[in-house]
Curated annotation (Swiss-Prot):
CDD domains for this protein: M20_DapE_proteobac
Catalytic activity: N-succinyl-(2S,6S)-2,6-diaminopimelate + H2O = (2S,6S)-2,6-diaminopimelate + succinate
SUPFAM superfamilies with a match to the protein in the record: Bacterial exopeptidase dimerisation domain, Zn-dependent exopeptidases
Assembly and interaction partners: Homodimer.
Gene Ontology terms for molecular function: acetylornithine deacetylase activity; cobalt ion binding; succinyl-diaminopimelate desuccinylase activity; zinc ion binding
Protein's name in the database: Succinyl-diaminopimelate desuccinylase
Binding site for Zn(2+) 2: 103, 138, 352
Pathway(s) the chain acts in: Amino-acid biosynthesis; L-lysine biosynthesis via DAP pathway; LL-2,6-diaminopimelate from (S)-tetrahydrodipicolinate (succinylase route): step 3/3
Length: 379
């Protein structure tokens, strides 16, 4: 069994349901410390994080490539629906089954073994290697990567490149990498009316009727046209509720929850202003609270994307598609202190599902891609 596969199995065997790390990080830290990494645990409100760095011969003047990822996994769902226990690594039909196999313990193992092989082959490497690992990516993500980024920023730590081990591949290893993600902004809208008997509408104000024209306009609005890297910004309603449940009462207010997934073609301030303008145009009496869970980030083609493309082609024969689709990731936090952030990992078809798995044949090439990028950028 390869070192990468063995470590993947060891990590899967630890039931690290978010935010419980179950000592996965300690296992990684022990391996990294043996290579000469300086390892620092950064805990926050029950979340375990660590930052590890091994300086190259150029010290802080050299480039720093960081691997970023998460040890936490989503809950298993009904255990009886799994073909084998989710935290017992199990091989069937050329696949390794277990919660976190694809998202993202194979990537974590690949990071560690790639670093081990690279340091053994290049003991005098010029650039530096970092690890930024959290147990709060699958949860609220309020005490994880963002806290490490804040700590690094406060001390002036600079990252030049970062690979996030998210499972970006689709049909096969290496067909897709993510060089950016859309931003996410939500709104909680309360439209105020006047409650009353449904038989006497002239004595009440129905907030649903008042909201409906504005809602139709918001749904039809084209917020932007996107750009070379991003599709157009989308606005979607996630929840609409009003009333007491009675059939003879006009509700006193209507509550609407909505979300923007927005590109670098729009700004938070611009989108908010346009929503308020539409609501105001319709004369609504309303309250609106905003929350921004992530800003969009984009890494244009450059040193990191070129190195990753070459490494993937060498291992798989594929030239990966650059994509910004999907939800948010911790890359949105890392982009604050790193100009080049790209996500790459195994196929994602089974993530978060019953019987999550990774094809065993992808484990070594995944590690090799990470090692090749190290060799190209910091050797």
């Amino acid at each position: 069994m390869s070192a990468t596969l063995a470590l993947t199995e060891q990590l899967i065997a630890r039931a690290s349901v978010t935010p419980d790390d179950q000592h996965c990080q300690q296992l990684m830290i022990e391996r990294l410390a043996a290579l000469g990494f300086e390892c620092e645990t950064i805990a926050s409100h029950g979340v375990t994080n660590f930052w590890a760095v091994k300086r190259g011969t150029a010290g802080r003047e050299g480039k720093l490539l960081a691997f970023a990822g998460h040890t936490d996994v989503v809950p298993t769902g009904p255990l009886e629906q799994w073909s084998s226990p989710p935290f017992v690594p199990t091989h069937r039909d050329g696949k390794l089954y277990g919660r976190g196999a694809a998202d993202m313990k194979a990537s974590l193992a690949g990071f560690v073994v790639a670093a081990e092989e690279f340091v053994a082959a290049h003991p005098q490497h010029r650039g530096s290697i970092g690890f930024l690992i959290t147990s709060d990516e699958e949860g609220p993500a309020t005490d994880g990567t963002v806290k490490v980024v804040e700590a690094l920023a406060a001390r002036g730590e600079r990252l030049d490149y970062c690979i996030v081990g998210e499972p970006t591949s689709t049909a096969t290893l290496g067909d897709v990498v993510k060089n950016g993600r859309r931003g996410s902004m939500s709104g909680e809208l309360v439209v105020k009316g006047v409650q009353g008997h449904i038989a006497y509408p002239h004595l009440a104000k129905n907030p649903i009727h008042l909201l409906a024209p504005a809602l139709a306009e918001l749904a039809a609005e084209q917020w932007d046209e996107g750009n070379e890297y991003f599709p157009p910004t989308t606005w979607q309603v996630s929840n609409l509720r009003a009333g007491t449940g009675a059939t003879n009462v006009i509700p006193g207010h209507a509550d609407l929850l909505f979300n923007f997934r927005f590109s670098t073609a729009s700004t938070v301030e611009g989108l908010q202003a346009r929503v308020h303008a539409i609501l105001d145009k319709h004369g609504l009496d309303y309250a609106l609270n905003w929350s921004v869970s992530g800003l969009p980030f984009l890494t244009p083609r450059g040193e990191l994307s070129n190195a990753l493309d070459a490494a993937i082609r060498a291992e798989t024969g594929l030239s990966p598609e650059l994509s910004t689709t999907g939800g948010t990731s911790d890359g949105r936090f890392i982009a604050r202190i790193c100009p080049q952030v790209i996500e790459f990992g195994p196929p994602n078809a089974s993530i978060h599902k019953i019987d999550e798995h990774i094809e065993v044949r992808f484990v070594e090439p995944l590690k090799n891609v990470y090692r090749r990028v190290l060799e190209q950028l910091i050797a």
